[in-house]
Amino acid sequence: MNIRVWGTSLLMFLSTVTAVGQTANRYLKAPLPQDWEESGEVFQQILPVDDHWWKSFQDTKLDSLIALAVDRNYSVAMAINRIAAARANLWIERSNFFPSIGLNAGWTRQETSGNTSSLPQTTDHYYDASLSMSWELDIFGSIRKRVKAQKENFAASKEEYTGVMVSLAAEVASAYINLRELQQELEVVKKNSASQEEVLKITEVRYNTGLVAKLDVAQAKSVLYSTKASIPQLEAGINQYITTLAVLLGMYPQDIRPVLESSGTLPDYMEPIGVGMPVDLLLRRPDVRSAELSVNAQAALLGASKADWLPKVFLKGSFGYAARDLKDLTKSKSMTYEIAPSLNWTIFNGGQLVNATRLAKAQLDEAINQFNQTVLTAVQETDNAMNSYRNSIKQIVALREVRNQGIETLNFHWNFINRDFRLSKTYLMHNVLCYLMRISWYRHKVVRFATDSPLQGFRGWLERIKINL
């Protein structure tokens, strides 16, 4: 990965965090490392406090793009939908704490058979209205544990939302920085192409006057066409990142293209990054927190499945009125009620309870393994991003030296040409063309070096993004 992607990653991962779970450590099958493999002056043993990490770019356009993405991105909308669904599931389970009450009203006409008893055949009718109630008393905690599981799932959905927001900001920033890099590279290539066209014109004039061979013209054309050949690829890359940003912003490319077609710059940013300690940092990542909460939910469901082995106690009852004549329905003599506590204990159901418990246990084990896998992946991603960011800083420093040396070489050649003006005109024209060819090459390199430093700064920012994921 290049330097751009790793730098900004680090900043994001550190910033978008939540409180550390108290139960996380008991699920870890291997203790977290006490320190990062990467340490030193580039990283600090502190945790970041700013969730809006992208504001460090000091780019108002990027700020507005991320704000727009938060409002319009469909992944964010779906994450919000999942939170709403998890909240609804929580209230569905909570409703089991309360009695179920129903209202009944009706008119009944019945006729008894005269051939089933010694009584004559009779016809009767009556009106009735009543309230009925059924209430499961959660004595052994089955309902309570299922409510706890839904609480954990609800919390996990919020962590997933946080993770979506982190990823969205990272993807927008990465695409934006890559776009800016390609736009600057395109400007450099176009400038080089213009200078190479000038050299080609001069070379053709010299060829027509017999001062140079046709090989010189062919070489000048080869350099020019090679430079021009890279332009379509850069333009295609620019279009690709514009369409990527359009999708992230929930828009069509034509709606956002006018805003992004003009090139821009980002500041060169190489200050130390606060990463804290692994035990503090990793357990605060949204993906790690979500995995931990999923373990808690499965543990609660296992407890609920075990509680299903125990008796269930119900309290049932009804209160109402019944009378043959509608006018007598509300009289005290028409009042009826029923109270019927009951106990229901399943002692055999073909192994359903046993296998339900086995299923819950297997799902808990799977969630624990997923949690440990998530932690290991988080350690790997963070270490890789930190290593890449450190090497990116070294690369930036080296490229700056190359740029400085290129500028010195260019200045030397210009000064040398200026001194040649003291020579004869014929000798001057011959050497000026030679130097123009060489200066064109050096100009290409120096302009490239001059832009490489900010481009590498872009890469450094993108590396910081990955450390924060």
Segments predicted by a language model, with ranges:
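Bacterial Sec-dependent N-terminal signal peptides
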Residues: 1-28
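Small/polar (Gly/Ser/Thr/Ala-rich) solvent-exposed segments
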Residues: 77, 97-121, 134-163, 182, ...
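Transmembrane beta-barrel architecture of outer-membrane proteins
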Residues: 62-64, 85, 126-128, 174, ...
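Amphipathic alpha-helical coiled-coil segments
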Residues: 78-93, 164, 170-190, 198, ...
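Bacterial Sec-pathway N-terminal export signals of envelope proteins
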Residues: 20-89, 266-296, 346, 375, ...
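Acidic, low-complexity, intrinsically disordered peripheral segments
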Residues: 22-23, 243-244, 253, 267-269, ...
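Periplasmic alpha-helical coiled-coil/stalk elements that build and connect Gram-negative outer-membrane
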Residues: 29, 143, 152, 158-277, ...
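Small/polar, glycine/serine/threonine/aspartate-rich low-complexity segments that form flexible
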Residues: 38-58, 67, 105-132, 255-274, ...
